[in-house]
Amino acid sequence: MECSNSCLTIDHVIQLDDDKEIRVWETLPKDNTAVRNNTILIASGFARRMDHFAGLAEYLSSNGFHVIRYDSLHHVGLSSGDINEFTMSIGKDSLLIVIEWLKGRGVNKLGLIAASLSARIAYEISNDVDLSFLVTAVGVVNLRDTLERSLKYDYLQLEIEDLPEDLDFEGHNLGSKVFVRDCFKHNWVTLDSTKNKMKNLDIPFIAFTANDDDWVKKAEVLEMMNSISSTKCKLYSLIGSSHDLGENLVVLRNFYQSVTKAAISLDNDSVDLNVEIFEPKFEELTSVTVQERRLKNKIESEILELMN
């Protein structure tokens, strides 16, 4: 565990077999804030590190939440492995490991916030673990369609031996063969597979779509929502946003505000966003972002030293 006096982010390491490790960051609730019932776990989107969600963690902790973030195995970030070996199942296993680790530390009331591709993983596990609530933003529900839209070609139609070695996804080389094999073997691909996992969801759930999202169809998110038997779920739209929630400061602030309101509402067993929030100052958001980048760089330097 590591935290300097000037940095409020606490660094943890989950040690696994084969010398692998998952890095976890913890942000404690700010002093003199409302007491919340649940801890928040944030699952970052594909090609996003946990420090990319520094602002959201600051918003949530400024409104009383204990916040946990992590980097998946075989992904960008501080955990072990290379992104060209990433699969949806590895993402799922990483999330489950962190949830189990939190339970071992006495964190039993947990709300999950997941974005983009990690939302598809959240949909997969939400009925299998003891969550208090779920929030997703620009969550993928039809993996095949999203991949085709983002990559400009339906690579999943090809035979495994005909796939290119790597796929350039958001500037990162995704190992195509290992990823596609896993998609079909473990049934990650279709909208129906997502609906089947979510239809019996019985925890409060809020989903956010973006009205300019070219990667996720709002109609398919709505179809998934309508397949859920519970009435404790609601769909909202992030107006003016694309799939990239950080494309500009206006979109980013709307994302922070909306998700923080959702977390507070769900913490009170409601799916209505008619709550007030405290907003951190821009200078505070900038400061914590810079501090976390420094912490990330320090950890990366230490990892490189150990490898040499």
Swiss-Prot record:
Active-site feature positions: 116, 213, 243
Top class in the EC scheme: transferase
Keyword presence, Repressor: no
Annotated TM spans: none
GO molecular function, one term: acyltransferase activity, transferring groups other than amino-acyl groups
One Pfam entry name: Acyl_transf_2
Source superkingdom: Bacteria
Role this protein plays: Acyl transferase is part of the fatty acid reductase system required for aldehyde biosynthesis; it produces fatty acids for the luminescent reaction.
Protein name stated in the entry: Acyl transferase
